[in-house]
A protein has these predicted regions:
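Polytopic alpha-helical membrane-helix bundles and their juxtamembrane interface segments
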Residues: 1-21, 25, 69-73, 77-207
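Early transmembrane hairpin module of multi-pass membrane proteins
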Residues: 11-14, 22, 26-62
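Membrane-water interface of transmembrane alpha-helices
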Residues: 54-71, 194-195
């Protein structure tokens, strides 16, 4: 519970800094994601565990990328291009395929990588695992768009955060569920704030 509260605290700070377009989104986020990699492994939410490991790597990438384009720790915001959307589609498809495969093979993995007495099949998927597959893809795309400083990242965060509220409540992670409720609210505020900033500092459209 203590680790969960600490992870929630730094996760909250990270989303707040993201809302402000402040580069501190990444160091605070790294602390949170590392803690949640351990917690999600413990709760057998492998999809979200993998996405938090991905968050850690993307946070380092985003930190470097933002540092090159930041002025007084505040970054320049832009809209998603056609090429970006193709990349998003590829990332989403990869995530859906990979995480589905991980859950499909879960009985084999939990049996110390032995097929003895193991039955594989989609009928063994838990309802929360289907949701986990979907939200993992949403968050993966959202994280990449945030690293690229695209305003549309907030749309993915809003949808993913909202879905995650009942998911973690079902898993008994009360503080994490509450965190995602706050994340949903902050993500909506972040989208509004970034949109206002973008309107005041227009960027030429790209194809």
């Amino acid at each position: 519970v203590v680790l969960e509260i600490i992870g929630v605290f730094f996760g909250f700070l990270s989303v707040w800094f993201a809302k402000k377009g402040n580069i501190w989104v990444y160091p605070t986020g790294i602390i949170s994601t590392i803690l949640f990699v351990y917690l999600l492994w413990h709760y057998v939410l492998w999809g979200d565990m993998l996405i938090n490991a991905y968050y850690t790597a993307m946070s380092i990438y985003g930190w470097v990328l933002w540092a090159k384009n930041a002025h007084n720790n505040v970054i320049t915001i832009s809209r998603t291009t056609s090429r970006d959307w193709y990349i998003c589609a590829g990332l989403g498809l990869f995530s859906l395929t990979f995480v589905t495969t991980v859950y499909y093979l879960k009985p084999f993995i939990q049996n110390n990588f032995s097929m003895e007495g193991v039955a594989l099949g989609f009928e063994h998927f838990l309802p929360t695992e289907y949701v986990d597959v979907f939200t993992t893809a949403i968050f993966l795309v959202g994280m990449w768009l945030m690293a690229k400083r695209k305003i549309e990242n907030w749309i993915f965060w809003i949808v993913g955060d909202f879905i995650s509220v009942p998911l973690y409540l079902k898993k008994g992670m009360l503080f994490t569920s509450f965190q995602y409720l706050l994340f949903t609210i902050i993500a909506i505020m972040g989208y509004i704030e970034w949109k206002r900033h973008l309107r005041n500092t227009p960027v030429p459209s790209q194809k």
